[in-house]
Amino acid sequence: MAAMDADIAPFDTARTDHGLMDRAVEQARAAVGLPVGTRIVAAMSGGVDSTVTAALLAKAGYDVVGVTLQLYDHGAAITKKGACCAGQDILDARMAAERIGIPHYVLDYESRFKEQVIEEFADAYLRGETPIPCVRCNQTVKFRDLLDVARDLGAEAMATGHYVQRSFAAGANRPQLRRAADPAKDQSYFLFATTAEQLDFLRFPLGGMDKPTVRLVAAELGLAIADKPDSQDICFVPEGKYTTVIDRIRPHGALPGDLVHMDGRVLGRHEGVTRYTIGQRRGLNIAVGDPLFVVKIDADKRQVIVGPREALLTQALSLKEGNWLGVEDSLEAAAAAGAPVLARVRSTREPVPGRLTLVPGPNGGEPRLVFDGLEEGVAPGQACVLYDPADPERVLGGGFIVATERAGL
């Protein structure tokens, strides 16, 4: 087992704000909820959040093992500012683990990440969807494969630097997933697919902190990454140009087609449906009187359908690959019961009220969400994350949007 915090020599305790540090350590202990000395794997990406997570757990007296996944290593993505899990970030994680005084392992998951995240990302665009690879990464590589590694290492829990909270309601025997204390950093949207079994094993020590506090803790500990920029956008997409990745992974996938007005008029040509997303206005290169937006993508017909902004208004959507953390057994069961929910269709938006219904069909039917009002620019492929209207901080689950019902179509 790891030594207690008094034995972690690399930390410069003389320069530490003990009030801040004591609060942070106690918060980490509370988030873990396991006896001091328990082995915990800390997922370390090389960023500020995961590094502080590992450091706080070590100071709290846990037996911490740092694990970093090498997920990709191609071209400009390696040196992209704000990337993670490649190149310099792996070196940063290794150096941080050495300073903290914990063992550190780097695991090569490049081929698995390529297959489960990058290729799925490209294929989703070819299907006319707008994918959300961060959810796929958490759902597969990080919260499935890495949890298996943690168990193989003899850990009782795995901690990450995500900004979400895990807590128990009175009398409950299973934890809830809840939004972070800092709304600006809340990552619950990206973790909706976390299963109840995974949540039993996971810990999120930073969920009750804000980012300025985390950076202060990093600075007090003398960690070199205290001022390192946050990761931005999609980690494996160089300079935000996602079409570069698609063209490399599926070089002959995107074929030209027609830009079609929703009234049936052909307005021009496009270079491939992968260049467009629902709600897009720029880059259409068509000259008409009123502003037009992408309202639908028909990949089978190679058509990008455009219309006025009001055509983006959505009254309902269908979900696939659902995950459910509520009292019902599944998302389908909650939908069959007509459960009221708060629904969030983009990470940058607040949840809005709606109600689940179930469309009869194979495999238990298809969950459907009907909004109380109208929601703009809902895109197939994105996540729809569901929260409890009686307790809006609680994540109930969600699914991936497979189809939408437009008010204007």
Swiss-Prot record:
Catalytic activity: S-sulfanyl-L-cysteinyl-[protein] + uridine(34) in tRNA + AH2 + ATP = 2-thiouridine(34) in tRNA + L-cysteinyl-[protein] + A + AMP + diphosphate + H(+)
Disulfide partners: 137-235
Residue numbers annotated as active site: 137 (nucleophile), 235 (cysteine persulfide intermediate)
Main location: cytoplasm
Interaction with tRNA: region residues: 185-187
Name of the top EC class for this enzyme: transferase
This protein's UniProt keywords: ATP-binding, Cytoplasm, Disulfide bond, Nucleotide-binding, RNA-binding, Transferase, tRNA processing, tRNA-binding
Family: Belongs to the MnmA/TRMU family.
HAMAP family per UniProt: tRNA_thiouridyl_MnmA
Name this polypeptide is given: tRNA-specific 2-thiouridylase MnmA
Organism in which the protein naturally occurs: Caulobacter sp. (strain K31)
Annotated gene: mnmA
